[in-house]
C-alpha cells in the first residue's frame, strides 16, 4: 500500500504542477505541508551526491535513489560516510510525521517510520524537480497526514 500511495502522489504532482514549483518567494507543494520555514540562501543540486538511510528502510531508500536518477537525472550513491542526504529514524509524536531540512551543506530527513520517510522523499522530489536542476531553497519542513 505504501508504494501505491507514493506513486499516486507522484502522478498527481506531475499532472497538476506547473513548470516551476517555486519562485523566489513562493513554494508550492502537493499536498500542502503543515509547516515550512524559509531560510536565507540555497543549496546547489550538484552537492547532492550521496544518501544514507536506516538499513531497515533500505528497499524504499533504494527506490528513491532510482527515482532521483530516472525523474531528475540525479545520480546519488548510497553511503554511510558523510552523506549529502541523511535520513534518520527518530521518535515522532505521530505516525507518518517527518522533518525535512535543507541546509548549506546538505539535506536532513527525520522520520519515525517508513511512511514518514516516503512522504519526505515525495516532498524532496517535488523540490528537486521544481528547481530545474540548480538550487534548492534553504528551509525546514514539518509535516504529517491531516
Predicted features and spans:
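Acidic, contiguous N-terminal accessory segments
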Residues: 12-13, 20-145
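Bacterial N-terminal signal peptides that target proteins for export
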Residues: 1-9, 20
